[in-house]
């Protein structure tokens, strides 16, 4: 039996596995930088210390890329799940139109949505961090009291899991 070994890191209740080109036989002799810096929440405008979270695992009978696609689609969120999201300011009846700004760089793709009648007021920000993390902020990350972290995991052919964490800051 040959078992491959890969560098791992535990952060905030997650175990990250760095699948390098070649497995290592001596895990004490790995000199690579941490491969998960773009997954760190504090690198994305969010501090753990002021928030509490709840976690849910959700299994789907479809390819994980389809779930990512749904989570990135702002209209899907509010038109399909509009009545289940407890928010009077952001729902399908209020958001008849909006402005959108898209930021693309090598680490992430981010969509920022602004109210049409108040183009300086951000109501939601969705950040996709490849290969499978999505951050959904309620408003600007610097002042947001709510963050949803979605980690998409392929489990097999038309099988996927999403680890959903809801972070909330209380007054």
Please describe what each predicted stretch is.
Residues 1-16:
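Active-site-proximal cofactor/substrate-binding loop regions of enzyme domains
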Residues 23-171:
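C-terminal catalytic domain of Rieske-type non-heme iron oxygenases
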